[in-house]
Amino acid sequence: MGGKAQFIRDFILKGPVRRTVPIEPVEPSTSGSIAWTSSESGSAHSSRVSSSPITPRKSAETEETLPTCLVRARGSSSAHSCSAATTSQQSNRQSKEHRIGGIKKEEKPIEMGGGSSENGGANGCSNGDNHHVLLMEKQEKIEPKVFRKRWVILVIFMFLSGSNGAQWIQYSIIANIISDYYKVSFQAVDWTSMIYMLTYILFFIPAAWLLDKWGLRLSVLLGALGNCVGAWIKLLSTHPDSFWVTFVGQTIVGASQMFTLGIPPRLAAVWFGPDEVSRACALGVFGNQLGIAVGFVLPPLIVSNGSVEHVTYDLNTLFLGSAVLNTSILALVICFFTARPAVPPSLAQVNALEEKTFDNNFWGTLRKLMTSRDFVILFITYGINTGVFYAISTLLSQMVLSVYPNETETVGYVGLLIVVAGMAGSVVGGFILDKFKKFKLTTIMIYLFSFVGMLSFTLTIDLDSMVLVFINAALLGFFMTGYLPIGFEFAAEITYPAAEGTTSGLLNASAQIFGIALTWLMGIVMHGFGTFTSNIIMSSCLVVGTILTCFIREDLKRQKAHSVQCTIPTSETQLTSCTLQQNEHF
């Protein structure tokens, strides 16, 4: 590949990162070969001694070259043994120290006996069901490190996710005005919201594969580009006969969601330390919720009912502001968003990088996830809770205006309160998880209070009191929206080391499936049988979700990986053993 082409490829996949001088491979000895290279990301490396040269394997996301693992447990009951060739007694003992992106490596020759042993011991290593052993000739001093830039990365993503969320609800919250202006039905207006869900269901698997294969930057870049293009197309739709144009623009923006919706847990794991990861994930979700809050408030304030000319002017203002904002965010992503830090922020991330190198089978991971009992239950319960939230958000204007017909602007504030309370719930939930690590208990309690909030909202909306509507909207939003990042983190724990982007992508797909089904069905029920009936059905769904959550087993595999134990027996053998508590991860 030419120099310019390689530079462009690296810039797209990794961003504006500093290049490091690669370390040349160590020359092989007569009895064995030692091979290792440095990576631009400074990730942990493993190496081995063998009778033949080592074939490195490449990880596309980081463009790092890593040797194949010496021993890899696959869940069989039998142990696997390995042996290393005897090195020359006259080999050079002078150690060399390199610093690669904050990771120190000391090269020392290995003196080991030949042969192997089934049970391990001095001359070999074994591998059983519950652990695997990495044999390395170099002592690695890996010091996980977090960088201040992680906050810049997180804030840029929050702006991107927020700009996408704001456009999701901008038509539905003024459904009566949009319906009159474009001369379309309320169901057509509802589809401007549901198209987000439909495009995600159709394309989330390719998007999850893209994130797993090529990393954060490319996914975020495509999401920002789609937001920008769709926003400018919608600016061309400010004419009563142009609903199809605005729908095309909204479809492009909705499709862009598939590149960003599953990012928060992946970004948190890649950039943040073990004591920050839940909060970082919560803040990533917080950005999307903040955008939805803006989508609830700004359209009713900017676009008011009136003549065709008046509505045209207001829509122009709304769409132009959105287009300029999304163009600015695209520029920020291009200039400042990088794929990963130079050094992994946690031991779990170091191990995840090695797992990705050894087992880079996206479809195999997908199959394992969908055959995991605990993940399948979480897949269903997450979809129920989030689907109910999507249905309420889309139908909120029609729910409230059916009882309070003159409160068009107030509806926007009700939606704002739901989302703002939910943002607070997301952050509080993240702090609780980081502090106490009680994932299952926290999930059950939030699910239970989501049901209480929904039931209270259902029973008070007809009491002719907007104060009660606001109070119950806050209660509903705090718990229901606060559930979103907690579900992501719970999934990351019980499926570790599966890529966080894959697990969150599946959870979001479940949310879109339930969301589109509940929005469509509850819209029919609401217009046919009334708001009370539709809300009771959604409350019943939350009861089912709460009960199902109790059957999820709390096996926090990622927390175990944070405390992985590494021992270096002697400087003579340089035999490094890393023992994990669990090998069959999910």
Swiss-Prot record:
Keywords, A to Z, come to: Membrane, Transmembrane, Transmembrane helix, Transport
State where composition is biased (Basic and acidic residues).
94-110
Q: Polar residues bias: where?
A: 28-37
Q: Where in the cell is it found?
A: Membrane
Q: Which Pfam families match?
A: MFS_1
The family this protein is said to belong to = Belongs to the major facilitator superfamily. Feline leukemia virus subgroup C receptor (TC 2.A.1.28.1) family.
What is this protein called in UniProt?
Answer: Uncharacterized MFS-type transporter C09D4.1
Write down the species: Caenorhabditis elegans
